């Protein structure tokens, strides 16, 4: 993880809280899930072995804060520009990250830590700054959402569902599950 020192300074090591590790945390996981998790376990075991767990979490948090500051600079500049009223900003990641949960340090799982992503949309006249929505959605919704926000018609057979109703009102009932896929044939479905 790379970030200027001032972002590391936001997270003193003595204040870093480590995730709880359960001795039998994988006991209820099917063999396929345990096998997937085992492929990347060496990285986490190495971090623990060398006493770098808190430092690794600190670096992760510093990187997030650094990225957040840069996004803030971009949005502040946009707010001061002539393009503020006709620019849609979409920011997302393709995966989340485990910080030791389930003895895992990486992405590459179908658990919450790896499937929950940052996902922000700022659309003039549609979204309100600081609004959050607890509904599960997936990245297949980005393209149809942008089409609707731009007043364009979707092509037939397009995957995904526009989330414009949620952008307008996060309390809108939502029955469409979020689907996450990792490698071929390994999926997770998340709904309310």
Where do the PLM segments sit?
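C-terminal cap/loop subdomain of S1 sulfatases and analogous C-terminal strand-loop tails that border
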Residues: 93-101, 127-128, 138-143, 147-192
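Active-site-proximal cap/lid insertion segments
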Residues: 1-136, 149-156
């Amino acid at each position: 993880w790379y970030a200027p020192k001032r972002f590391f300074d936001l997270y003193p090591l003595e204040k870093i809280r480590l995730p709880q590790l359960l001795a039998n945390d994988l006991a209820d996981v099917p063999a396929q899930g345990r096998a997937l998790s085992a492929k990347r376990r060496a990285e986490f075991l190495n971090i623990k072995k060398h006493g770098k767990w808190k430092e690794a979490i600190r670096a992760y948090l510093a990187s997030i804060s650094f990225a957040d500051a840069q996004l803030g600079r971009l949005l502040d500049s946009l707010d001061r520009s002539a393009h503020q009223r006709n620019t849609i900003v979409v920011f997302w990641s393709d995966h989340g990250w485990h910080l030791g949960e389930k003895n895992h340090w990486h992405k590459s799982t179908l658990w919450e830590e790896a499937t929950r992503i940052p996902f922000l949309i700022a659309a003039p006249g549609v979204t309100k700054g600081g609004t959050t929505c607890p509904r599960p959605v997936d990245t297949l919704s980005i393209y149809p959402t942008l089409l609707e926000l731009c007043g364009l018609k979707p092509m037939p057979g397009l995957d995904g569902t526009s989330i414009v109703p949620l952008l307008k009102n996060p309390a809108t009932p939502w029955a469409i599950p979020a689907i996450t896929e990792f490698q071929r044939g390994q999926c997770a479905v998340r709904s309310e």
